[in-house]
């Protein structure tokens, strides 16, 4: 309900990982709904944080591939810190990892109960469904096909290119 209300109240979303497939689509969805979008990627997070700007958006969509050394975007203190943030969509969904960039929750959510309330005043809800990126099967299939097609086109020469490198000794 709050996301729908965002289109009428001038809420803002921040998408981190905005240059990737999932982040691009997340930003597109927000824009299509009339939600103002701040797009961040590696350049904007290279400083390592902290990132108080994340807490000044009402919606945060995490679309990164978290790895060791990943900065924290939402610290545990965000539950009680002054903030505008009320909705987190952790599309990357890696809450139990030591390098999760979102420290306000510790478990995935499910389709039958997609939101987890982690703070009350103001409310802060997290959606973290571990198979959510699979909702983009067409985009994933097209991207995979475009990556595979050049290799398939050289299948007639098994000694060259990727086929030659893949050959067992």
Q: What is the meaning of each model-derived region?
A:
Residues 27, 31-35, 66, 149-160:
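Generic secondary-structure signature for well-ordered alpha-helical cores
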